[in-house]
Design a protein with these regions (language model features):
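Catalytic cores of carbohydrate-active enzymes across secretory and cytosolic contexts
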Residues: 1-855
């Protein structure tokens, strides 16, 4: 076999248009599609052949074409405008972050994720987490937030999906050609490719560093596929979520530990805080602690407190299986030489990744590791925050589940990435000037009402026609490859109708997402879809993990249903779901169907992408829709009820779905005026855009992260670093508290048990607290009350701080009182408790210390 050396020959950009090269190497273009239109003008055919990849295009376009457009006045006018916009964007100091937090402009937020969905040309993502992470970086750039991203570069990317004639998913991995992408190697001081390493048992794993520019944000990716590694180690970063548990622990050591060292030791950055997304990067906590111990010469416990002030953890999963749990022997293999460097024992190390208790054989949980150390923790929707507090309540067994220190920041989308270009033009015309810079404000979206119905509907129909053309191409290719004749294929695709009510369902095919729920009652669905004069089309797309047999069975079943005579040409299953396909779907269907098994959807963002494009949501009240639904902006499936079995839940939800389709959605869609427009439909469509456009953008999401998590931690960690002695004192305070907490006694003073009073009255309650070995300034006493159920559970809890009225210093007894407001009728329960208090205590629940009154 011949071996060839590779030489890349690039056409030379004329000086007049040389900025095409710089902008092509910055993913700013992925949400500024005006730039991409320049390439269409240079050579439309080549642009399509290059799959709309500007870097690849500039390597293949002829020198003649470049010279020609560099003298084209019309082209140059547009080029100059776009170049100016790019320069202004990259160099502007007038950003949201700079204006609101000028004193924090030198801070750095390091954002870690195992996957990033930035653009279809860079397939290093698999699903929701990746798309969210990509959108997170883009909005951080828009808002001027000083953020840097860290991830892994998967040369195989995520798999390409084919669906054969039997409906079976086939997976295909292909190497990404990095030289055709806006990904560039980072250079060291000598101009060579930067290579770092991380320690593995008896060897080093070497990693090449790559960089992607995402507007003003830099994303660094680590790559083990280099000659310095053995063949096995070269595969560490080959596939996303591939391999066995040992491969996963290797990947997560690289992401977390090598990622920290890349930033701090090799790039000379000093991140103020670190943001972990899922438990994949949780090992970064250990590297941070190790570095603090070495730098500050402090104990493990003090270093852990400082690390807590530097870390945010976001959980994106609503189920225990969503967190990696590594066998103890595997953890020992990779960390037995590490925990001595932290100054702790094997048992102390292993317990960092376990819930409290004596069992050391339960496995090392990456989610628990992050929860135990991170100073701030959050879920990704209001409901998911509550689910997460319950899910991880045993990490803080003494704390009421509803008070576990896990908050929430509801996910959003990077609007300009997902907004159809024609809609963007329409919004530019009717919304306020500079709406894109202020999209997180609700008032911006009120102007949607001013868009004439016919103009909005016309754009929607245009998007729908484009989607139908794509469905025809995708289906034709899939069926042709499977041996279907031209006549058979044409019989199916010719039935696609832009006037038909079109419902879309596209997402990862996990079983809890219930992709086949709509077919629960095939006979009823047959009646619904074959109603003369009111046609319906269903379009499905999505991948199942290669190891998920049940998910693949769902795909197969949808294929089989789509080939039933009564559904042929009305149900379509598209293959190779990716960002490009998603853009067509979320802007081209009429209704976005989402029916996960509640409450197992952490957030879900596909419906947010749909709503900003005027596609109306039809969803279970789960994830973001549980807080986004307003009764006038879409439809719901089922209720908030809890069921004894999945079968009962599926039956109830499917019946609700059919009823809403028959009684609300279909009649509303087909109730047209003389211009062929449904006024009621347009009203719901506009309400959908107005109520979700700002609230569910990543612009709003990043504002929330910054205000609620990033800035408080940035300011706290700087205080910690400025006075390590205070941290040591705080650590000693905690140790003393743990030793003496059991001695606290609470006695109720005035007993109102089993009394009856009128609604609207207040009662004054009091208790005596005995503190044998704890200073009274180190605690807070609270009244804890709410409506009490027959089973003794108190709901709708209110917590009121109590006032210190009397002190008996000799006997260490203190008397507290407060008033309880009982505004509405019902049965109430109340009690008292003691909680720790310290100015350096970020979240009281983190200590897992609470003393309740006992008889």
């Amino acid at each position: 076999m011949y071996i060839f050396n590779r030489i890349t020959v690039n056409p030379q950009l004329p000086k007049r248009i040389e900025k095409l090269g710089e902008i092509s190497n910055n993913l700013w273009w992925s949400w500024n599609t005006e730039f991409l239109r320049l390439f269409q003008k240079i050579d439309m055919d080549l642009w399509e052949q290059c799959n709309k990849n500007p870097v690849k295009f500039l390597k293949q376009v002829s020198q003649e074409r470049l010279e020609k457009v560099s003298k084209d006045i019309s082209f140059l006018r547009e080029y100059d405008k776009i170049s100016e916009n790019f320069e202004n964007y990259m160099n502007s100091k007038n950003t949201w972050f700079f204006n609101k937090y000028p004193e924090n402009k030198k801070d750095i937020i390091a954002y870690f994720s195992a996957e990033y969905g930035l653009d279809e040309t860079i397939p290093i993502y698999s699903g929701g987490l990746g798309i969210l992470s990509g959108d997170h970086l883009k909005s951080a750039s828009d808002l001027g937030i000083p953020l840097v991203g860290v991830g892994l570069l998967y040369k195989n990317g995520y798999f390409h999906q084919k669906i054969n004639g039997y409906g079976q998913q086939e997976t295909e991995y292909t190497n990404i050609d990095l030289y055709d992408l806006p990904i560039n190697p980072v250079k060291d001081d000598k101009g060579d490719d930067l290579t770092i390493y991380v320690k593995f048992p008896k060897r080093r794993l070497y990693l090449k560093v790559w960089q992607i520019n995402v507007g003003r944000v830099k994303l660094y990716l680590l790559d083990s596929d280099i000659p310095k590694n053995n063949e096995e180690d070269r595969d560490v970063t080959l596939k996303l979520y591939g391999g066995d548990q040992e491969m996963r622990i290797r990947q997560e050591i690289v992401l977390g530990m090598a990622g920290v060292n890349l930033l701090t030791k090799y790039l000379g950055l000093k991140p103020t805080i670190y943001h972990m997304n899922e438990g994949h990067s949780s090992f970064l906590n250990l590297e941070i602690i190790k570095n603090i111990i070495k730098e500050k010469q402090v104990s493990f416990e003090v270093a852990k407190d400082i690390a807590s002030s530097k870390t945010v953890f976001t959980t994106h999963t609503p189920v225990p299986a969503g967190n990696d749990i590594f066998p103890i022997d595997l953890v020992e293999k990779y960390f037995k030489d590490f925990w001595p460097r932290l100054g702790i024992s094997r048992e102390e190390f292993l317990k960092l990744g376990m819930k409290p208790g004596p069992d050391l054989d339960s496995g090392f949980n990456m989610g628990i590791l992050a929860l135990k150390i991170a100073g701030k923790k959050n879920g990704v929707s209001k409901l998911h925050g509550a689910v997460s507090r319950e899910l991880f309540s045993d990490v803080w067994p003494n704390i009421a589940a509803n008070e576990s220190p896990i908050g929430y920041v509801t996910n959003g989308i990077h609007t300009c990435t997902w907004l159809a270009p024609k809609l963007k033009e329409l919004y530019n015309k009717y919304l306020i000037p500079y709406w894109q810079d202020n999209m997180h404000h609700d008032y911006v979206w009120e102007k949607i009402k001013n868009i004439p119905d016919d103009k909005l509907w016309s754009v929607h129909i245009d998007r729908k026609r484009k989607l139908i053309n794509l469905v025809k191409e995708n289906t034709t290719e899939r069926l042709r490859r499977s041996g279907y004749s031209y006549e058979e294929i044409n019989e199916i695709v010719s039935k696609l109708n832009p006037d038909a009510l079109t419902i879309g369902f596209s997402r990862r095919f996990a079983t809890y997402k219930r992709a086949t729920l709509i077919f629960k009652d095939i006979e009823r669905m047959t009646q619904i879809m074959n109603n003369l004069g009111k046609p319906i089309q269903l379009i499905f797309a999505g991948k199942a993990h290669p190891a998920d047999k049940e998910g693949q069975d769902l795909i197969k079943y949808i294929h089989e249903v789509s080939m039933m005579p009564q559904f042929k040409g009305k149900i379509f299953l598209l293959e190779n779901y990716n960002i490009a396909l998603s853009r067509y779907l979320v802007s081209g269907v009429d209704v976005w169907l989402n029916n996960p098994r509640r409450p197992m959807e952490a957030s879900g963002t596909s419906g947010q992408k749909a709503s900003v494009n005027g596609v109306i949501n039809f969803s279970v009240l789960d994830g973001w829709w549980a807080e986004g639904y307003t009764q006038t902006n879409g439809w719901t499936i089922g209720t908030n009820a809890e069921y004894d079995s999945y079968e009962a839940q599926d039956m109830a939800d499917s019946q609700s779905m059919y009823h809403t389709l028959e009684e609300k959605i279909i009649p509303t869609y087909y109730d047209r005026d003389k211009n062929g427009i449904s006024k009621k439909w347009m009203e719901i469509m506009k309400n959908s855009i107005i109520t979700t456009g700002g609230k569910y953008s990543t612009a709003r999401m990043l504002v929330d992260y910054t205000n609620q998590l990033y800035i408080p931690l940035c300011n706290l960690t700087k205080k910690y670093y400025e006075n390590i002695d205070n941290v040591a004192s705080y650590n000693a305070w905690k140790k003393e508290l743990f030793e003496n907490w059991k001695d606290i006694k609470i006695t109720q003073e005035n007993n109102f048990d089993n009394i009856t009073i009128d609604a609207g009255n207040n009662i004054e309650v009091g208790c005596e607290v005995e503190l044998p070995n704890i200073d009274v300034d180190n605690i807070t006493v609270e009244a804890y009350y709410g409506k009490i159920l027959d089973n003794g559970v108190v709901e709708n809890v209110s917590i009121t701080p109590m006032k210190l009225e009397e002190s008996d210093e000799e006997h260490k007894k203190y008397y507290y009182t407060t008033k309880i407001e009982l505004t509405t009728g019902g049965n109430y329960g109340y009690t008292f408790r003691v909680m720790p208090k310290h100015e350096m205590l970020l979240e009281p629940a983190n200590l897992n210390l609470v003393k309740w009154i006992t008889k």
